Amino acid sequence: HYSSRRQRQMCIRDRTKTGQKCDDKRQEFILLSDVLGISALVDTINNRKTLNATESTVLGPFHVKNAPKKSMGENINQDGKGEPAFIFGKVTDTEGNPIKGAEIDVWQANEDGFYDIQQPDVQPEMNLRGVFTTEENGKYWFKSVKPKFYSIPTDGPVGTMIFATGRHPNRPAHLHYIVSAPGYKPVVTHVFVKGSEYLDSDAVFGVKDSLISEYKFCLLYTSDAADDWSS
């Protein structure tokens, strides 16, 4: 509802600016949907929690299709910056049966809070991205860096709106996942870092308690270590 011609013109102008900020590496409209809570609402409506299933959350504007396929245990951190982390888990159905051959598409921001496509002249292409395939037992593991909280892009109309409404633009530390397997519905989700700043005020309303995980100090980066910690 527009109460005046001026408000209508302002709305048209702002949405035009939003479109002009989009390109093949940045989707300002997705970002707008995220910060308005629309993405989270649509996710909640379309992906109601199923018993024993991992909860979903927003996709975000920086997913890249055709990320490189990686060998199990490979490091997705190409520039060696950041605090090393060993990530592991197990993909199962809702009855706990392991799923072999599930694809796990992961991506994250670097220690400075930027995704590779935001810094094409700074980060290696496809830095902190990779696709892994689960083994017979449904398990996966890989090396990366511990995620940190970061600000969403504020150099466009979405940033202007955020600041005009007195909100902060920050997201808590997280790792993105898309998990898919033949015969199963894909899951778009995050794993958030327990204790991270902004868990209770995520700028895009993506946090769910079940998706918060603790990072523990580890000396061994092997599949055996993953077995020990998950047992």
At which residue positions do the language-model features occur?
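Compositionally biased low-complexity segments at domain edges in trafficked proteins
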Residues: K208-L220
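Residue-level preference for beta-strand/loop junctions
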Residues: Y2-S4, E83-P84, M126, R171
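Beta-strand-rich domain onsets/edges
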Residues: T16-I117, A203-G206, L220-S223, S231
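Single conserved hydrophobic/aromatic residue that forms the stacking wall/gate
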Residues: H1-R8, I12, Y221-S230
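Short, acidic Ser/Thr/Gly-rich low-complexity loop/linker segments typical of extracellular
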Residues: G113-K139
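A short, solvent-exposed loop/turn motif at the edges and junctions
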Residues: K146-A173, I178-T189
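Extended, solvent-exposed segments with strong compositional bias
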Residues: V131-E135, K139-P153
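Short beta-strand edge segments in extracellular beta-sheet folds
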Residues: F192-S196
